[in-house]
Each structure stands twice: as C-alpha cells, then as structure tokens.
C-alpha cells in the first residue's frame, strides 16, 4: 500500500463516528466471524447507552430491542431512573446481573481501556467498539483475556446486514 493510501485510510479512520468511516482491513473481521459471534450471543451490555432519543446509542439500543433476540443491559452511571422502552440502566458493568456475551462500547476511544478491564472482570466474551472507536490498549487487554475484539463497527448495521446468515447459523 503506498503512503498516500495509508494516509487516506488513517484520515478516514480518525473521522468522527457520525461520518461512518469504513474500518481498516486489519480490524474488519470476516463476515463468518461476525455471523458466529452474533448468532451465538444471547446478551449484550451497552456501555455509554443514552436515555436521550437524539443520541446514536439510544437509536441502536432501541433497534436491538426490537429486531434481535438479545437480552439488553444498558450501562450509564448518569442515566438515573431513565429507561429505554422499559429497560432501566445499570451504573456499571459490575452491576449487570449476568455476564454479557458482548460488551458494546459507546465511549470515547481514550475511555475504552477502562471499559475493557470492566468487560474482562464481567466475564464478557466480546468487546465491541462502535463506529469511530478503537483503542489498541483496550483491544490487547481484551484479547489477553481470551475475548474477541471488534473495532470501528456498528452492531446494528452488522446485525441487519448479516441477518439471514445469523438466522441460518442459529438453526445449525
């Protein structure tokens, strides 16, 4: 890959989440890997879920509640008594009553290492960083604990895109 392409990829990679950057090839897991992760998972904790309807995390949580079989746990220490479609919030991953299969992160990249440590302590299987979010330290922490790591991908987009494959894998 020439320097111009590398620079272009880095520029796109560093763009804010709202611009929906495409993941770099090195961090984009194959569709069969994503399919297996999503088909085998039963519970998802969303760290940084927002009770505010104008936030992306709120829209993603609402979609997951209405279009997937996942048991959803919303994590936000500042949400108080708020809810999303009847789902209340937990102050931390440690407060979630069961080990989540997937921990989805809607936090700034620099805050993800602490979330990774919490995800390991919660015995999660997957650390999933949403669009525009990646962190090498967090990824290394999760991988060292045997977790799968997904960076810079939207769980809603991937689930919708792979819906048929997920359904087939769940039956198999």
Feature names for model-found ranges:
Residues 93-133:
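Mid-chain, well-packed structural core segment of small domains
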Residues 11-41:
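Short N-terminal or domain-adjacent regulatory/targeting segments
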Residues 67-71, 122-127, 145-147:
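A short helix->loop->beta-strand "cap" motif at the edges of active sites that frequently abuts
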Residues 85-93:
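Active-site regions of enzymes building and remodeling cell-envelope glycoconjugates
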Residues 51-55, 62-84:
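NAD(P)-binding Rossmann-fold cofactor-contacting core
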Residues 45-47:
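Conserved beta-strand elements of the Class I
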Residues 158-172:
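A charged, well-structured terminal subsegment
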Residues 131-159:
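Rossmann-fold NAD(P)-binding glycine/threonine-rich loop
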């Amino acid at each position: 890959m020439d320097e111009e392409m590398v620079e272009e990829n880095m520029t796109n990679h560093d763009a804010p989440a709202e611009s929906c950057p495409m993941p770099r090839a090195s961090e984009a897991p194959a569709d069969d890997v994503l399919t297996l992760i999503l088909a085998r998972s039963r519970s998802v904790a969303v760290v940084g879920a927002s009770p505010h309807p104008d936030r992306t995390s709120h829209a993603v949580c609402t979609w997951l509640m209405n279009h997937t079989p996942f048991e959803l746990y919303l994590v936000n220490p500042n949400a108080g008594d708020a809810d999303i479609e009847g789902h209340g919030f937990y102050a931390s991953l440690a407060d979630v009553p069961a080990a989540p299969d997937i921990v989805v992160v809607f936090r700034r990249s620099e805050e993800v290492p602490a979330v990774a440590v919490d995800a390991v302590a919660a015995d999660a299987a997957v650390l999933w960083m949403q669009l525009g979010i990646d962190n090498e330290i967090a990824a290394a922490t999760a991988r060292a604990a045997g977790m799968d790591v997904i960076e810079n991908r939207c769980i809603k987009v991937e689930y919708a895109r792979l819906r048929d494959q997920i359904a087939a894998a769940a039956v198999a």
